[in-house]
Amino acid sequence: DRSVSRGLGDVYKRQLWESELYIQEFEHKFCNLLRQYLPASSISQRFFETEMKNLHMYGYGLKSIMLSMTETICKVTDGNGNMHLIEEVIGWGQELLQKPVTLLEGVKETISSLHGKYKLVLATKGDLFDQKRKIEASGLREYFHHIEIMSDKKIDDYQRLIDTLGCPPEKLLMIGNSVKSDILPVLELGGYAAHVPYHVTWAYEQHEGEIRHPNFIRLDSIKGILDKL
């Protein structure tokens, strides 16, 4: 659909590097750490409930995850857990906070191809310090006209961003892997949204049902957007 490119001003992107896979591996280790208290599936559920309860206070990111894991330990052990459990969580979390950034396949080539043709904007959510580290380590900063680290990615958050950038919704294309955070809000604002599926998705970001919208683009990989513009 080559009409997507007509008058397109800003192209927004997120999920450029490996992240969710590492976090789910972290959670798997955490659930095994507490297996003497409850089955792993029960620990996972308790942890998710704690995460959801704390989102409005801690926001997104690895530090928020570590705090919710610590609280889950206290709940599951009735406050009698060995300090070694918390030390393990802190150690694993700090390892992830220093983990080298691995770009997803096709990201560098796609961004370099779009650079200079469109204003590229990186819109991501999470811990400010951690996200800034990843952006610098990715080697992609030079390609972006603007970088926005958002506290959340709902309609109002996107509206504030496009108001700041002076880009009307109909000239916006969002490319992302989360239907809930990257696709639906942008479509509702009247922009274009391209979904790049990823094999691992956080339970909070999962979405059921088919998307039917004239501005919705389904891709097999991020490189596929080059054939749509």
Put a short name on every predicted segment:
Residues 124:
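Conserved phosphate-coupling serine/threonine residues in phosphotransfer and NTP-handling enzymes
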Residues 1-12:
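Single conserved hydrophobic/aromatic residue that forms the stacking wall/gate
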Residues 88-108:
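Long amphipathic N-terminal alpha/beta scaffold segment
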Residues 42, 46-95:
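A metal-dependent, Asp-based hydrolase signature
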Residues 14-16:
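Short acidic, Gly/Ser-rich segments with clustered Asp/Glu that frequently serve as metal-coordination loops
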